[in-house]
């Protein structure tokens, strides 16, 4: 993060139940990082992304929050792009480049995190083009709630508090990002689908089990039918 052209004020690592070896890595990282690092942990009780995100939100005084996953590499202007595009009453969703399995292995071995042009094996490589001109043309406000990437989102903390954060009814993989998007829209917030800026590269890995999608779809459908604005189980 210290290599970002606009570094964040702090880094919060939201840890959903990792063991002590992860804490040792984070402690080592914290000592080498110039930016303050907070390690927020919760007990392993299955996939509880909404819960650990809420715990992280409670543990920061920053007024604008950028969410990323632990399996992505950030363009050096990633933070800058989110900050430059923030506006009152707006939240931002971005895209990602999906690196191939072989390319992911190569990068992990060589520790080469610089991406030059589009000469690397990946899906959605157009998402790796950073252009302020193209971004102005193709970035649009929209009301879509699906295909939202929680690994590339940003919000005002006050807006997250208004919708009571992420809904911890969602456990297992899926739909918590669609749910908070819908509740933000129900509270008259604007969603910016940011293109050709806020670039990130997703490392290949096997997908998580998706056996909770049907349950989570039912919760999302309740949010839709009830025009829900606040999380049922959220920040407070």
Model-derived features: where do they sit?
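Conserved donor NDP-sugar-binding/catalytic core segment of glycosyltransferases
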Residues: 77-118
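The conserved acidic donor/metal-binding loop of glycosyltransferases
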Residues: 69-73
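Short aromatic/hydrophobic "clamp" motif used to bind/position activated sugar donors
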Residues: 65
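Short, flexible, basic/aromatic active-site loop/helix in glycosyltransferases
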Residues: 112-145
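Acidic donor-binding segment of Leloir-type glycosyltransferases
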Residues: 1-46
């Amino acid at each position: 993060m210290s290599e970002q052209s606009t570094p964040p004020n702090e880094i919060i690592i939201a840890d959903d139940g990792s063991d002590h070896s992860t804490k040792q890595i984070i402690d080592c990282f914290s000592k080498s990082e110039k930016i303050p690092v907070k390690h927020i942990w919760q007990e392993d009780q299955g996939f509880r992304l909404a819960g650990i995100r809420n715990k992280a939100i409670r543990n920061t005084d920053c007024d604008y929050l950028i969410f990323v996953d632990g399996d992505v590499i950030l363009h050096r202007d990633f933070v800058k792009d989110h900050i430059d595009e923030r506006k009152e009453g707006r939240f931002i969703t971005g895209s990602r480049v999906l690196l191939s399995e072989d390319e992911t292995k190569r990068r992990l071995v060589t520790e080469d995190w610089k991406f030059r042009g589009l000469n690397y094996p990946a899906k959605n490589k157009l998402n790796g083009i950073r252009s302020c001109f193209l971004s102005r043309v193709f970035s649009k406000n929209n009301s879509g709630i699906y295909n939202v990437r929680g690994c590339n989102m940003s919000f005002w903390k006050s807006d997250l508090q208004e919708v009571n954060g992420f809904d911890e009814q969602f456990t297992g993989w899926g739909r918590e990002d669609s749910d908070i998007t819908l509740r933000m829209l129900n509270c008259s917030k604007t969603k910016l689908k940011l293109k050709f800026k806020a670039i990130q590269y997703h490392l290949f890995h096997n997908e998580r089990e998706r056996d909770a999608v049907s349950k989570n779809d039912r919760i999302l459908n309740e949010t839709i039918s009830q025009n829900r604005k606040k999380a049922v189980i959220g920040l407070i």
